[in-house]
Amino acid sequence: MSVSILVVDDETDVAELFRQHFRREARNGTYVMHFANSGEEALDKLTAGIEPQPIVILSDINMPQMDGLELLREIKTRRPDLPVMMGTAYGDDERRRLAGEYGAACFITKPVDFDFLKTQLRDLSDAAD
């Protein structure tokens, strides 16, 4: 079974970075990656029904307009069962606390440790099975 992931980040180079680090897994069908450049675009994709449906979302916190914390709250209102991993380059304790309070599955710091991220994704996909 493929694990479908929606990565949300306003930095345009993030999609390419994820494609590089998940190249092998994408090729063998372990992961299917979807990308959105804003919280609004992520909600549009979830509403439109991208296939396969994401079983986990990885969102940046610091984005213009709808930030990652607002996105997290909206996703948890619509799909409380969908795990959302939050990422940021800033070690802000208050944002980390809020992310946990709003229902984040875990917190990832940037630059991303892709080995750690893959372990987290495996754990979440095993829990979803």
List each model region and its residues.
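Receiver (REC) domain switch/active-site region of two-component response regulators
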Residues: 113
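Helix N-cap/capping motif at the beta->alpha junctions
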Residues: 35-47, 68
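Alpha4 helix (beta4-alpha4-beta5 surface) of REC/receiver domains from two-component response regulators
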Residues: 70, 90-108, 116-119
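Two-component/phosphorelay signaling modules centered on CheY-like receiver
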Residues: 12-35
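Receiver (REC) domain switch/output surface
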Residues: 117-129
